[in-house]
Amino acid sequence: MKLRWTCIVFLALFITFLPFCPLPLYAQTQKEVQYIKAYLGGHEVQVTYREGGPIYGTFFFLDVHFCASGRYLLFGQSRKQTVLGNEQVNNWNDSGSWDVVTFQGHAALQYVATSGARDIIPMEVLPDGRVHPLTGASMQQIGRAQCK
């Protein structure tokens, strides 16, 4: 009897507060997807992050040109301090296709490199309108994309 009463109370509370729940989460995510596509499309973005420890970790600096056509051009550089006090610098470039999709309830940047590498990076829109990856990297819009 007590279990039945508990279930009835729970059901009544659920029905009572259902209108106050943010039900259209899918619609909100779709708005973010469209916003992030517009934010990235046609712009050059600088991404910086570090892998490894604070002393001998590797710092990455990426300049990514997100073309409105769905293509991207990436110019990357990594920098790492060696045990001997030298700095090891590597430069590379990449290209491929990009899109913003819904992934596990988040807006996410999906890319496929011409080399075949692919990834999905969850993104968020900050209160000031900037877009930020949820991976801990720093991202800043720095100009118009140079697309051919």
What kind of feature is each model-predicted range?
Residues 1-5, 98:
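Positively charged n-region of N-terminal signal peptides that target proteins for export
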Residues 8-22:
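Bacterial N-terminal signal peptides
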Residues 3, 12-13, 26:
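Low-complexity intrinsically disordered segments
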Residues 25-148:
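Lipid interaction determinants
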